[in-house]
Amino acid sequence: MSTIIYPSPIFGPVHSRRLGISLGINLLPADGKVCSFDCIYCECGFNEDHRPTLPMPTRQEVAEKLEEKLKQMAADGQLPDVLTFAGNGEPTCHPHFAEIIDDTISLRNQYCPSAKVSVLSNSTMIHRPQVHDALMKVDNNILKLDTVDPIYINKVDHPNGTYDVETIIERLKAFNGHVIIQTMFMRGECKGESVDNTGEEYVAPWLEAVKQIAPQMVMIYTIDRETPAQGLQKATHEQLDAIRDKVIAAGIPCTASY
């Protein structure tokens, strides 16, 4: 098992399958993982295997390191297409997430005004007013909804604490369309149980929830790197294309990453 722990607070730039040339912003510790999910497919590994000893970067550290990197990229003539909050876990867990978003937008406007600001989140903190308001300010508010099946969520995403999918859907609807839904589709088994969510019994109710949320876009994808759990398999091109086409037929733009 090979997993990735990203530098903090800035990493890359990297080429994102979904976003282009992406400069990563990691609000989590540089030596471990902090997440409200513990997904069996996470490229950063299981939470218990990567407990951090370092603190989260401060708001000031993030701003200083981001400005330093943007100055360097400008001098090199290679500005990013997108500034992406991702990294070792859930970015909205940071206590100063909202303020860091404001700082990032200001630096973006100064150094690379054509770049987008994106946040990749698992949707668990969107009940916090300051998180919701901050996500309304970013260009790409990319929020996870892997399924609407509670058993599947607990089996695959392993949320910490209470996670009620109906409540999450209502909170996603509260963005009034300023949201991109991101969903992982995969096949295979984990601990002797199927984790295949590509079948109609999973896709149909998920699509109904997506219609209710009415996002600006849906991004579906599959496993791209090694996973901490064994026995997982990529969804096929044909499966992803079929799901994508159903979303598009519902009037919602959709991309598939293989």
What is the predicted function of each stretch?
Residues 45-82, 96-99:
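Conserved alpha-helical substructure of the radical SAM core
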Residues 1-18, 71, 187-258:
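Auxiliary Fe-S-binding modules of radical SAM enzymes
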Residues 93-233:
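Conserved AdoMet/S-adenosylmethionine-binding subsite of the radical SAM
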Residues 18-61:
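Canonical Radical SAM [4Fe-4S] cluster-binding loop centered on the CxxxCxxC motif
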Residues 84-90, 122:
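Glycine-rich beta-strand-to-loop/alpha-helix junction loops that act as flexible
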Residues 32, 90-91:
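Short strand->helix junction
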Residues 22-24, 82, 142, 180:
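Short hydrophobic-acidic sequence motifs that mark active-site Asp/Glu residues
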Residues 27, 85-87, 183, 222:
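Short glycine-centered, acidic/aromatic-flanked micro-motifs in structured strand/loop junctions
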